[in-house]
């Protein structure tokens, strides 16, 4: 890896299409300009706070160089810093490893930090599994063996993933024998670094008892997550069921699960014994990743090769679709942020009401003038207003800009401003839903992908979140109220239907967006 500090990302890579977006990051496909024309994934972590230090453009992280330990950082800043720190440790102590995503290079510029990563084009773990008609214990053991191999290397390097779930396990390519890679280290932790902030994130299905009770999280916590993944692979549903999310938390804390469903009757006793050990409430009783790699079932010696009941795949398909609809529930929470910004914007701009044509022109001018394409500086925002001959708003530009510069980095996300202006004109419940949907339908495909939604909550300041939504697992409870059959494609109609299923739920999430 070159140590030339003057290199730019564009010197070495051609950036092609967008693969996914998050609350503060974007992942794009890149092609190296070398003779090999290697395809990579370029994850850009947007600069949200002080300029990053400790990683120079185009250089491999230097052992001992360190990263700034900011005493007071936002959630996004903590995640950004944390992911870079963990990826640096992976480069130093893990890579190359067949089951851990590989970091090729690091660049830094005014737009943020660019991680040039190995491209995994084979899809997510569960997406690959549900694509089959049936599979065997032996196939499941192969999956667990690869996850354990990656975790063994990470744990030896004192890295705890902390967010291990099917979405973070991707296949290298679409080949049937493709290797499985562990990725997404935004919530991971390493020794000598303060714990990342995790209170706002996702499902509790894979969260260990010690993490739920805010006790010390260790490598054993990752092993609990492996146990949950294995249980789902062999049964098609998660191990902890309950009528309410609070009950689910209690069952996790007490380790209450069973093998009573009829689909478990054909599963080998060795597999069930392994799950029971992995889902031990006491962390010290769980096998390590190294233990798993020596386990007869994981090795394949006693894993059945007979195809499992087709009902297992059917259940897994429904669980996978349900998981993706959870992303739609998270998207609806974004409405709270839109409502807050819209109210302030309305007060600021008074009676100025953009027409539909003006809104379309606003979008076009943003795309033409903003060099970044997504984030704009104050100067670019003023250029947009001038181009639209909206001179009366130019004196207000700094105040409007400041309203949306949530991270105080001197740039704003143009999608938020567009959504805010749109909400001045269209603030009814259904329109709010559509705005929420369109805002993160980045490719305008009419379908929100999992990648577009996965980091939705990361974009929300805590003060914009409703009520107790930040409590561990609360989003699962919201989702459970919206539960419906799905084919896994989150179209607007599906999104709207999920919200309209429960009028009380819609009142909670959308009332603030209705006309006052």
Curated annotation (Swiss-Prot):
Pfam families: EF-hand_5, EF-hand_7, Pkinase. Induction: Not induced by mycorrhization. Induced by hydrogen peroxide, abscisic acid (ABA) and dehydration. Mainly expressed in roots and panicles. Detected in leaves, shoots and culms. GO terms for cellular component: cytoplasm; nucleus; plasma membrane. Its EC number is 2.7.11.17. Its main location: nucleus. The modification Phosphothreonine is found at residue 263. ATP binds at residues 19-27, 43. It catalyses: L-seryl-[protein] + ATP = O-phospho-L-seryl-[protein] + ADP + H(+); L-threonyl-[protein] + ATP = O-phospho-L-threonyl-[protein] + ADP + H(+). This is Calcium and calcium/calmodulin-dependent serine/threonine-protein kinase. The lineage of its organism: Eukaryota, Viridiplantae, Streptophyta, Embryophyta, Tracheophyta. The gene is CCAMK.
């Amino acid at each position: 890896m070159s140590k030339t500090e003057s290199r730019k990302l564009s010197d070495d890579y051609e950036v092609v299409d967008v693969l996914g977006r998050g609350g503060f990051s974007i992942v794009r496909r890149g092609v190296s300009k070398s003779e090999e024309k290697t395809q990579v994934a370029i994850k850009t972590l947007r600069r949200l706070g002080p300029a990053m230090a400790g990683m120079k453009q185009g250089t491999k992280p230097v052992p001992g160089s360190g990263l700034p330990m900011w005493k007071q950082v936002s959630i996004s800043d903590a995640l950004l810093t944390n992911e870079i720190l963990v990826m640096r440790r992976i480069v130093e102590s893990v890579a190359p490893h067949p089951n851990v995503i590989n970091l090729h290079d690091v660049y830094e510029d005014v737009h943020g930090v660019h991680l040039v990563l190995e491209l995994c084009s084979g899809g997510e773990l569960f997406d690959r599994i549900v694509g089959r008609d049936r599979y065997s214990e032996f196939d499941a053991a192969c999956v667990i063996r690869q996850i354990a191999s990656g975790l063994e290397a990470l744990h030896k390097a004192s890295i705890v993933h902390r967010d291990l779930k099917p979405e973070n396990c991707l296949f290298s390519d679409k080949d049937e024998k493709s290797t499985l890679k562990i990725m997404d280290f935004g919530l991971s932790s390493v020794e000598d670094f303060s714990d990342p902030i995790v209170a706002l994130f996702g499902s509790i299905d894979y969260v260990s008892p010690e993490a739920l009770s805010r006790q010390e999280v260790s490598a054993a916590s990752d092993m609990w997550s492996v146990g949950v993944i294995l249980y789902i692979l062999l049964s098609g549903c998660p191990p902890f069921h309950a009528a309410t999310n609070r009950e689910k938390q209690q069952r996790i804390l007490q380790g209450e699960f069973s093998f009573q469903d009829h689909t478990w009757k054909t599963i080998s006793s060795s597999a069930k014994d392994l799950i029971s050990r992995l889902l031990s409430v006491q962390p010290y009783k769980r096998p390590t990743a190294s233990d798993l790699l020596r386990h007869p079932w994981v090795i394949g010696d006693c894993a059945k090769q007979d195809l499992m009941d087709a009902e297992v795949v059917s259940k897994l398909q429904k669980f996978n679709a349900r998981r993706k609809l959870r992303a739609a529930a998270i998207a609806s929470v974004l409405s709270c942020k839109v409502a807050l910004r819209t109210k302030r914007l309305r007060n600021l701009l008074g009676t100025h009401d953009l027409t539909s044509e003006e809104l379309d022109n606003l979008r076009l001018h943003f795309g033409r003038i903003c060099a970044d394409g997504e984030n704009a500086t104050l100067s670019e925002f003023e250029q947009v207003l001038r181009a639209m001959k909206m001179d009366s708003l130019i004196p207000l530009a700094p105040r409007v800009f400041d309203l949306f510069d949530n991270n105080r980095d001197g740039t704003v996300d143009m999608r938020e401003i567009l959504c805010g202006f749109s909400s001045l004109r269209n603030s009814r419940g259904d329109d709010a839903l559509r705005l929420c949907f369109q805002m993160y339908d980045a490719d305008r495909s009419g379908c929100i992908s999992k990648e577009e939604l996965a980091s939705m909550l990361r974009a929300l300041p805590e003060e914009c979140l409703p009520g107790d939504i930040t409590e561990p697992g609360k989003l699962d409870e919201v989702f459970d109220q919206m539960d419906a059959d799905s084919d896994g494609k989150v179209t607007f109609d599906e999104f709207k239907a999920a919200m309209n299923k429960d009028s009380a739920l819609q009142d909670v999430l959308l009332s603030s967006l209705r006309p006052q």
